[in-house]
Amino acid sequence: MAKAKKKGATLFKVVSTEGTGFFYLVCRNLKNKQEKYSFRKYDPVVRKHVLFKEAKLNK
């Protein structure tokens, strides 16, 4: 089943800094966190954990 739409929550794309083009989609509440997301996650293209940074989601 699909997730329920949260009020005030927005969908964002976090892109690998390795330049592979791999990305994750993240839903976050803008009222709680104003700063941009950046965290380490697994990039299957380079097969290691790398830093991912927030980017705009093109609709």
Swiss-Prot record:
Keywords attached to this entry: Ribonucleoprotein, Ribosomal protein
GO BP, sorted A to Z: translation
Any matching Pfam family: Ribosomal_L33
Single GO molecular function: structural constituent of ribosome
Gene Ontology cellular-component annotations: cytoplasm; large ribosomal subunit
Protein family (similarity comment): Belongs to the bacterial ribosomal protein bL33 family.
HAMAP family the UniProt entry points to: Ribosomal_bL33
Protein name: Large ribosomal subunit protein bL33
Positions of transmembrane segments: none
